[in-house]
From Swiss-Prot:
UniProt subcellular location: Cytoplasm
Protein name (Swiss-Prot/TrEMBL): Bifunctional pantoate ligase/cytidylate kinase
Residue numbers spanned by region Pantoate--beta-alanine ligase: 1-277
Entry's Gene Ontology molecular function annotations: ATP binding; CMP kinase activity; dCMP kinase activity; pantoate-beta-alanine ligase activity
Length: 527
């Protein structure tokens, strides 16, 4: 691991590395929450860079800049243990060679900084946006990782990247909590033992409001009242604000639609703590990841049918783009022409009732129903090459996320739960032993009249797993909060029923497994 002090050294390091770069900006005093960001980057990126910089321009005159925890040696040890490739530890003079009144800064949109912490900390988000833009320009990562605990900061940075057309994916990462729910924060170390015992009241307050929301309340005053009632029992917690705002614009809400951000800030002793929860009124999302041959496609389709959810056929989306490329006669290896095509593409998935009463997926692109056309041999022959293109992947992930805003779907892939739908209500990692997956593959091949060598099949499976886990685009990885389901020896029905029980146990729905009369258990096939 390299420790870099000057921007010049960082640029030299950046020019010396190849592959995708992930970036985790921090102010030091690292804890398990920071480590989760690093581990997420380590899963997805070839090179991981962490910055440690206490940014003076995001602190107000009466704030804790002078006493912010400084634990550089411990931070470097954590980074090295987590597999970080380089840590950038600049001085304030290196990043800010001129006084603030003589240097360019970033002014975030007023709508994003007038509420929540923006009211209490004037100038804070200007300082955050300025330093983040500087760091992103220096590091030039493909991805940058930020925690959802700092929800307002995250939204400001997302808008920054959008407005400046930076070719960087901002990856939101779930809040990491103590067993009693307290969100991890570098400022937690300010708390005394007694204050620490009461600080968890912040999360209990948020949960009380969330339960009120799940019970049907959509009035923001009722939700805030439910939260503040909990804090009345924690005298050490001095509430600064508790607000319901739009999850995207951060504007205050009186009535809650399908999605909102419930945010809270309080003083506990000398520590200022913040936390939040996203209130989701939409139907749940189930994200299913896993290696090839675990039965993902088969189980996902059955789950969608039994739970009344949309089966998000990501493969059909890639096929639709392939069909469009072929119809337009463009060279998919020409990134400029491909980018123009995707910018104009209108891709829609619709759920239509089938003759047997089930739901059937209809795929439209540019207004054309291509449900049947995308299954032709011509499309099949080219879809793998098209799907491997980063521009296509980026376009379709955005399309999938837009569909996910409505909820009520189940999707499968390699990184659905970690990248496409990191906020999915239920994440499943469907897997099977190599021997079981080889056996299933052998059965499929034998049904086609082919002879097979099980040892060779197992070796091929191990090699594919390695390639899928190390690939630059959409690597196979298990989400930290995913439930692993081993499918060895289980029928499709048994696996589906197990996932439905998990779905119901989480209070996501009351659907129960519905067997078709006369149906016999079906073996899992390749997914």
């Amino acid at each position: 691991m390299r420790q870099l002090i000057s921007p010049e050294a960082l640029r030299a390091f950046r020019q010396s590395v190849q592959g995708s770069v992930g970036f985790v900006p921090t102010m030091g005093a690292l804890h398990a929450g920071h480590r989760s960001l690093i581990e997420r980057s380590r899963q997805q990126d070839d090179v991981v860079i962490v910055s440690i910089f206490v940014n003076p321009r995001q602190f107000g005159p009466q704030e804790d800049l002078s006493r912010y925890p400084q634990t550089l040696d411990a931070d470097l040890a954590l980074c090295e243990a987590a597999g970080v490739d380089a840590v950038f530890c600049p001085t304030a003079e290196a990043l800010y060679p001129r006084p603030s009144d003589r240097s360019t800064g970033v002014q975030p949109p007023a709508e994003l900084i007038q509420s929540l912490c923006g009211r209490q900390r004037p100038g804070h988000f200007q300082g955050v946006a300025t330093v983040v833009l500087k760091l992103l320009q220096l590091v030039q990562p493909q991805r940058a990782y930020f925690g959802e605990k700092d929800a307002q900061q995250l939204r400001v940075i997302q808008r920054l990247v959008e407005d400046f057309n930076l070719p960087i994916a901002i990856v939101p990462c779930p809040t990491v909590r103590e067993p009693d729910g307290l969100a991890l924060s570098s400022r937690n170390r300010y708390l005394t033992f007694e204050e620490r015992s009461q600080a968890s009241g912040l999360y209990r307050a948020l949960r009380a409001a969330a339960e009120c929301f799940q019970a049907g309340s959509r009035d923001s005053q009722e939700l805030v009242a439910a939260a503040t009632a909990v804090l009345a029992t924690t005298p050490a917690v001095q509430l600064e604000y508790c607000d319901c705002v739009d999850a995207d614009s951060l504007q205050p809400l009186t009535q809650i639609p399908d999605r909102a951000l419930l945010a809270i800030a309080a003083r506990v002793g000398t520590a200022r703590l913040i936390d939040n929860l996203t209130l989701q009124g939409r139907r749940p999302i189930i994200a299913i990841d896993g290696p090839a041959g675990a039965g993902k496609s088969t189980v996902t389709k059955r789950l969608a049918q039994q739970l009344g959810l949309l089966y998000l056929d990501t493969g059909a989306m890639y096929r639709a783009v392939t069909w469009l490329v072929q119809q337009q006669g463009i060279d998919p290896q020409d990134p400029i022409v491909l980018a123009e095509l995707l910018a104009q593409a209108d891709l829609q998935l619709r759920s239509q009732p089938a003759a047997d009463g089930s739901e059937q997926l209809q795929v439209l692109i540019q207004g054309n129903d291509v449900t049947a056309a995308i299954r032709t041999p011509t499309v099949t022959a080219q879809v793998s090459a098209i799907a491997a293109l980063p521009l296509v992947r980026q376009f379709l992930v955005e399309q999938q996320r837009q569909l996910g805003q409505r909820g009520g779907l189940v999707a499968e892939g390699r990184d659905i739960g970690t990248h496409v739908f990191p906020d999915a209500e239920l994440k499943i990692f469907l897997t099977a032993t190599n021997a079981e997956r080889a056996r299933r593959r052998a059965l499929d091949l034998e049904a086609q009249g082919l002879t097979v060598d099980l040892a060779q099949l197992e070796a091929e499976i191990r090699d594919r797993d390695r390639q899928d886990s190390e690939r630059a685009i959409a690597p196979l990885c298990k989400a930290e909060d995913a439930v692993e389901v081993l499918t060895d020896g289980l029928s499709i029905e048994a696996v589906t029923d197990q996932i439905i029980r998990l779905y119901r146990d989480r209070g996501l729905g009351d659907s129960s497994p519905q067997a078709t009369p006369g149906q016999t258990p079906s073996p899992l096939s390749l997914g």
